[in-house]
Amino acid sequence: MNKASGGDGIPVELFQILKDDSVKVLHSICQQIWKTQQWPQDWKRSVFIPIPKKGNAKECSNYCTITLISHASKVMFKILQARLQQYVNHELPDVQAGFRKGRGTRDQIANIHWIMEKAREFQKNIYFCFIDYAKAFDCVDHKKLWKILQEMGISDHLTCLLRNLYAGQETTVRTGHGTTDWFQIGKGVRQGCILSPCLFNFYAEYIVRNAGLEETQAGIKIAGRNINNLRYADDTTLMEESEEELKSLLMKVKVGSEKVGLKLNIQKRHLLLERKVMTNPDNIFKSRDITLPTKVRLVKAMVFPVVMYGCEIWTVKKAES
């Protein structure tokens, strides 16, 4: 299997071959970084490789990006991730399931499914609003991020390490036609870095707190507490028994988000409603040029994952089991 080298061109296999020697060198470098709070410039660099998606190839928005960073730097990032974890567990509420151990999208799907079942059982109306941000991870303001980390109680030493990592970071874009000059990035969390999901979760938590969602009495009463939102990183679901109250919650989140530079993605919400599993299946399944085994593989690859996603939360009657 082919594996990508790091942004510095050094493959991970080299560290595996060197074994103890590489461990000693990396340990020494990580100690030095922790003490001085300064990073090697190579560890601040990343290589972007754009991969085309569907649509017009001339539109930048129709590309996703693979990011290559130094494999050696990932050791230090793993150390910082472990340090940040204690703050994650302390500061983030249980309604946030994004990038947290033992939690996932299926948990939030199950929660919403359960709430809907209870609403039917007790004949209550529940209104949901599904929010998505436009380029959320790319729009994080660095100055605001450091301020938020301080307000979350993260140590000055750790915050300074992260600030210096972001200061002067550089990237280049590599395509089949060549590589661009290095240029600096002044906004957004680092792509390809394991610290980015954690940092964004703090950013998103600040928005919710600043919007006053935790203090308001709006929401649904569950086990004696008010629940008015469920989150998975930047994907947020607001819920309320009143349509007017839901609109009020949405406006609070909108205002709080705009204060830190994030905007709601109205277009994507519309597209999600209209999205189909396969745009034109007749051309495929009625074609005599495609063999039956190939058609079966297509169904397994394109239909089953969509239809069966979240099947763990399906309710099965006793007679059906």
Where are these regions (language model features)?
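Residues that mediate protein self-association or partner binding, especially
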Residues: M116-A119, F130, A134-F137, A233-T236, ...
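Non-catalytic, peripheral interaction segments enriched in hydrophobic/basic residues
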Residues: E274-S321
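Eukaryotic intrinsically disordered and solvent-exposed regulatory patches
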Residues: W34-T36, H113-E117, T216, A223-R225, ...
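Short, conserved micro-motifs composed of acidic
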Residues: H177, L264-R275
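Catalytic palm subdomain of template-directed nucleic-acid polymerases
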Residues: K135-M152, L230-V260, R275, T315-K318
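Active-site palm subdomain of RNA-directed nucleic acid polymerases
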Residues: L80-Q96, L199-A233, T237
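Conserved pre-catalytic core of RNA-dependent polymerases
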Residues: M1-Y203
